[in-house]
C-alpha cells in the first residue's frame, strides 16, 4: 500500500480537499485503485450536528455516515463509495481509545496520547485503507490521506505525531507528503515568507514535504518558485503551482502539466505495483474522458439561470454537493450555469417592511430564473419564503426541484393553496398546532431525544408506483422500477393526507418499500415539478449527473425531452468510470 498525505499550512480552507482528490484522480489515470481518508481534528464524533454555516455541508455516505464535505469531493473525483470509517475525527478516535480502556484492552497501563492514541490512529488508517471502495471489490493500491485544519494547531498535534511515526512504520518508498501552502500577492508581489514559515514548522514536527503545492491567485513566477525551493530545501520540480482556475475540474490537468504524477511515480516506485494491460488502458481512457468532459467549461454556451432558494446562502459550501450536481448537469446539457443565490427570508412579506431593496432583489431573481431549486435544511427560518417560491414555480409553470425540506415545502404549499388549508405546516416547525394541520410529521421510529446519528440515514430504495409511466423523473431514471438514493431526515409527509393530495393532483410517484412513506412527488401537467425526500446530489458524478438535477437543468434550458431521449449523451457511450 502506498500512502500520500496532503497537509496544509498558513490558513485552513486553502484547497487541500480538491488537491487531494485531484492527486488521487491522477493516480487512477495510471490504472491504480485509489481510496481516500479524511482526518478532521475536531471533538465532534461526526459532522451530523454541526451548523452548515460553521463547517459547510454535511455529506452523507451509503452507510449513513455523516461526514466532512471533502468526502464528497473524493467520491466525485475518484468514483468510489466510501464508509463512515474513512472520516477520522478527534472525537471518534478518542471514543475508540476510551472504549478499549474500559474493556481492559490496555491491561492496566496508563493510557496516553503517545503511544496509545497515536497507535490507534495508525491502526485505523491501515485498516480502513484496505477496504475495497470501487466496483472491482479489490484492495486499493494507493490511499490519499488529507489532514484537515492547519499544521501547528493544537488540535492536529496527535495526528501529526501519528503520521510522523507512520512514515517509518510503512517505509519511505510507501509514504509521500504534499504540503499545501498560501502564496499571497501583496501590491503585485508574490510573497514566499508564509510558505517558508509553514515548511519550517512542518519540519520541526518531524515531517518533510516531498512536494509543496503553492496556492496563489495567479501563476507563480519562476523566481518565486526558485526562492521557495531554495529556502524550503526542495528542488524546483517539487514546487507545484496551483493557481486559481475557472473550475476545480481543471486542477488535475493543472497538476498533470507540471509533472506531479511523474515525480510521485518515481518517489513511490509505483512501477513496482503489478497492473494488467486492461487496467493501464482503463486509466488512459479515464484521462481522455476527463479532458473531454471538463473542456465544456471553457466553451461558450447558452446560459441557464437557476434560483437556489436556501437558508445558508452566506456560506456557499453549505450546498457544495447541490452546486456540483448542478454543474454536472449543466455540462451534460452543454449549458453555462448561473446560480442565483436567494436568501429565503428575503422573499417573505416581513422583508418588504424591513429591507425593501433585498426583498425586490430576491423576487427579481426568482421571477426571472429559468428554474427554481429548494435544497435541504432544518428549522423554521425562511420556510415561508420557500413556500412562496414553490407557489411561484407551480403557478407560473417554472421548472422546480425540491430536495428533502424542499419536498415538504412543496407539499405544504400545495395543501394551503390547492386544498385551502391555510394553517397547514410541519410538526418540525410548529409541533403545538392542531395535528390535523400537520402536513409533515415526525417519523415514528426516530429517537426524539438524541440529535446525533438519529435520523433516517444512508442508501435506501425508492419504488416507483403503479400507473406512473407518464412520470418525467421515472423516464430520467431510465424507466426502472426502483432507485437507490441517500437519505438524511427525521420528518415525512403525513401518510393520512396522501390520498387527498393525490386526488387533487399532487402525485407521489415514488415510495419506500412499505408503500406508505413518500419519496418522490410530481405534478402531472407541469413542465417539470419534482421533489424528493432523499438527497440525489450526494451520488452525482461528473459523467453521470444526478437525474433529478439533470431534469431541472434540462427543463430550464428547454431540452428535457431531448435529454430523456439520450440526445445529449456522450458520443463515446457509457460512463465506464463511475465519476
UniProtKB/Swiss-Prot annotation:
Activity's dependence on pH: Optimum pH is 8.0.
One GO biological process term: CTP biosynthetic process
Swiss-Prot/TrEMBL catalytic activity: UTP + L-glutamine + ATP + H2O = CTP + L-glutamate + ADP + phosphate + 2 H(+)
Activity regulation as described: Activated by GTP and inhibited by CTP.
Active site positions: 404 (for gatase activity), 535 (for gatase activity), 537 (for gatase activity)
Enzyme class, broadest EC rank: ligase
Sites of the Glycyl lysine isopeptide (Lys-Gly) (interchain with G-Cter in ubiquitin) crosslink: 422
EC number(s) reported in the record: 6.3.4.2
Domain named Glutamine amidotransferase type-1: residues: 305-559
MF-aspect GO terms: ATP binding; CTP synthase activity; identical protein binding
InterPro entries cross-referenced by the UniProt entry: Class_I_gatase-like, CTP_synthase, CTP_synthase_N, GATASE, GATase1_CTP_Synthase, P-loop_NTPase
Listed pathway(s): Pyrimidine metabolism; CTP biosynthesis via de novo pathway; CTP from UDP: step 2/2
Entry function: Catalyzes the ATP-dependent amination of UTP to CTP with either L-glutamine or ammonia as the source of nitrogen.
Family: Belongs to the CTP synthase family.
Quaternary data: Homodimer. Oligomerizes to a tetramer in the presence of its substrates UTP and ATP.
Note: Present with 57600 molecules/cell in log phase SD medium.
Protein name: CTP synthase 1
Amino acid at each position: 500500500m502506498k500512502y500520500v498525505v496532503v497537509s496544509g499550512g498558513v490558513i485552513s480552507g486553502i484547497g487541500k480537499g480538491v488537491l487531494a482528490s485531484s492527486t488521487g484522480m491522477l493516480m487512477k489515470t495510471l490504472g491504480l485503485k485509489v481510496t481516500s481518508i479524511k482526518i478532521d481534528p475536531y471533538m465532534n464524533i461526526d459532522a451530523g450536528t454541526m451548523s452548515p454555516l460553521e463547517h459547510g455541508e454535511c455529506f452523507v455516505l451509503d452507510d449513513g455516515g455523516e461526514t466532512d464535505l471533502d468526502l464528497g469531493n473524493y467520491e466525485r473525483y475518484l468514483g468510489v463509495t466510501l464508509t463512515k470509517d474513512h472520516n477520522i475525527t478527534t472525537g471518534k478516535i478518542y471514543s475508540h481509545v476510551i472504549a478499549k480502556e474500559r474493556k481492559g484492552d490496555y491491561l492496566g497501563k496508563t493510557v496516553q496520547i503517545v503511544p496509545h492514541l497515536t497507535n490507534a490512529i495508525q491502526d485505523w488508517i491501515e485498516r480502513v485503507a484496505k477496504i475495497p471502495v470501487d466496483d472491482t471489490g479489490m484492495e486499493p493500491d494507493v490511499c490519499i490521506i488529507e489532514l484537515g485544519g492547519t499544521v501547528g494547531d493544537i488540535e492536529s498535534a496527535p495526528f501529526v505525531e501519528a503520521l510522523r511515526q507512520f512514515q517509518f512504520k510503512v517505509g519511505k518508498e510507501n509514504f509521500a507528503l504534499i504540503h499545501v501552502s498560501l502564496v499571497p500577492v501583496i501590491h503585485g508581489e508574490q510573497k514566499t515568507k508564509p510558505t517558508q514559515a509553514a515548511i519550517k514548522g512542518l519540519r520541526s514536527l518531524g515531517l518533510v514535504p516531498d512536494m509543496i503545492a503553492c496556492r496563489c491567485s495567479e501563476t507563480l513566477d519562476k523566481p518565486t518558485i526558485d526562492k521557495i525551493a531554495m529556502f524550503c530545501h526542495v528542488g524546483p520540480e517539487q514546487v507545484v503551482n496551483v493557481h486559481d482556475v475557472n473550475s476545480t475540474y481543471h486542477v488535475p490537468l493543472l497538476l498533470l502539466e507540471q509533472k506531479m504524477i511523474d515525480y510521485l511515480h518515481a518517489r513511490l516506485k509505483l512501477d513496482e505495483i503489478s497492473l494488467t494491460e486492461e487496467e493501464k488502458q482503463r486509466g488512459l481512457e479515464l484521462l481522455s474522458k476527463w479532458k473531454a468532459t471538463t473542456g465544456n467549461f471553457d466553451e461558450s454556451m447558452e446560459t441557464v439561470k437557476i434560483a437556489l432558494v436556501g437558508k445558508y446562502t452566506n456560506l456557499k459550501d453549505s450546498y457544495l454537493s447541490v452546486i456540483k450536481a448542478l454543474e454536472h448537469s449543466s455540462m451534460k446539457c452543454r449549458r453555462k450555469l448561473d446560480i442565483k443565490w436567494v436568501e429565503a427570508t428575503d422573499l417573505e412579506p416581513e422583508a418588504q417592511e424591513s429591507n425593501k431593496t433585498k426583498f425586490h432583489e430576491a423576487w427579481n431573481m426568482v421571477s426571472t430564473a429559468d428554474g427554481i431549486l429548494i435544497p435541504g435544511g432544518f428549522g423554521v427560518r425562511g420556510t415561508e419564503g420557500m413556500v412562496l417560491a414553490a407557489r411561484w414555480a407551480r403557478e407560473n409553470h417554472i421548472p422546480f426541484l425540491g430536495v428533502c425540506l424542499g419536498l415538504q415545502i412543496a407539499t405544504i404549499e400545495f395543501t394551503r393553496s390547492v386544498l385551502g388549508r391555510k394553517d397547514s405546516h410541519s410538526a418540525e416547525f410548529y409541533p403545538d398546532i392542531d395535528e390535523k394541520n400537520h402536513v409533515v410529521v415526525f417519523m415514528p421510529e426516530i429517537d426524539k431525544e438524541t440529535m446525533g446519528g438519529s435520523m433516517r440515514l444512508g442508501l435506501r430504495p425508492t419504488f416507483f408506483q403503479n400507473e406512473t409511466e407518464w412520470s418525467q423523473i421515472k423516464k430520467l431514471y431510465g424507466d426502472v422500477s426502483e432507485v437507490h438514493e441517500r437519505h438524511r431526515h427525521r420528518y415525512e409527509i403525513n401518510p393520512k393526507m396522501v390520498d387527498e393530495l393525490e386526488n387533487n393532483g399532487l402525485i407521489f410517484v415514488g415510495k419506500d418499500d412499505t408503500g406508505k412513506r413518500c419519496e418522490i412527488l410530481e405534478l402531472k401537467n407541469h413542465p417539470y415539478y419534482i421533489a424528493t425526500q432523499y438527497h440525489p446530489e450526494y451520488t452525482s458524478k461528473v459523467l453521470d449527473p444526478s437525474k433529478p438535477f439533470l431534469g431541472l437543468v434540462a427543463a430550464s434550458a428547454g431540452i428535457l425531452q431531448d435529454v430523456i431521449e439520450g440526445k445529449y449523451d456522450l458520443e463515446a457511450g457509457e460512463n465506464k468510470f463511475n465519476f
